[in-house]
Amino acid sequence: MNCLKKNEHSARRCTQINHRCLSVCIGGRFSKPNFCHGLVYNRSTHTGVMSQFHSVTFVDIETAAKLLADIAHRTPVMTSTTVNQHTNSQVFFKCENFQRTGSFKFRGAYNALLQLSADQKQKGVITFSSGNHAQAIALAGSLLNIPTTIVIPDDAPTVKRSATRGYGAEVILYDRSETYREELTQTLAQDRGLTIIPPYDHPHIVAGQGTAAKELVEEVSGLDLLLVCCGGGGLLSGSAIAAKALSPNCKVIGVEPERADDATRSFHTKTLHTVNNPDTIADGARTPSLGKITFPLVLNYVDDMVTVSEEAIVRTMFFLWERLKIVVEPTGVLAAAALLEGVINEPDAKIGVIISGGNVDLSQVAQLFTSS
């Protein structure tokens, strides 16, 4: 089964593949992820999903933090008097838009690449991403002298594609509407002997992402609530593990776009739901579903899931650009939008909000702000 030649830089759906449940290499091991409806998780007995994988713990996050200490930025925590007055709370923004490559993704990417064997590092890695994980893997690979190949949708923001190439990665574009990225990535990995580092469903990725919340909770003691955006659930699950370990009474709420609400539905029904190619400006949240690792972690550690509208995302972007003077992308403001738009109402509370990234095309921002 070969969907394309090794050096072909465009892709179309392989007609030989008539299903989506392929084996995917995760850190050198093969498993069979579920991309379909109907995966039920029993929270009380931990049956099914979690038993097949390494269960990520706070110890893993602490280990990742030590490995990242001199590599990743310890990003700033910002406050706003206007936001505090508007919400009648103390709000603390953890600004991962100031992280290397412009998003939290660098934390997990570097941590995951460090764990590879010498042979895996020599052969190289491959991943699929809408842009932020792509840049993170590309930079981490460059720093560690590991060849990187990135499968990116052709509608990903230009700034993300350009930066990924700039970090030295080979970029392969595909059409979201015609190609299953997991299948394309798997085929390339098999042809070239590469190790797949998925964008969220990987224990070392989750552990690395959790270091952002670890820093926030350690810096701002006594948080009552932590708001985190959710795409595939890597940042959300890692953040929840860290928050519950350091501040057990802190509630953790994940936030998605209304148009990409697979995780919210999965959380409330305890059944894994899929939304393919959701039409949302939050490109980092266009993942079809939570993963086999992140789904049970979200169920175990997260207290609630909510959604925000496209209009709320744009208004929040504008507000943060105008008042905090920071560049933020649509996905990056999901958590903030839930608070500022009143989806979450927690007066007299200490609230942490993770701003996940700031990689956005200026032309896109101009169009969004003008149209709103």
Q: Over which residues does each language-model region extend?
A:
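PLP-dependent amino-acid enzyme catalytic core
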Residues: 50-372
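N-terminal hydrophobic alpha-helix used for membrane targeting or insertion
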Residues: 5-8, 21, 31, 65, ...
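Hydrophobic alpha-helical membrane context
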Residues: 17-20, 30, 44, 117, ...
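Short, low-complexity, charge-dense intrinsically disordered segments
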Residues: 1-27, 35-50
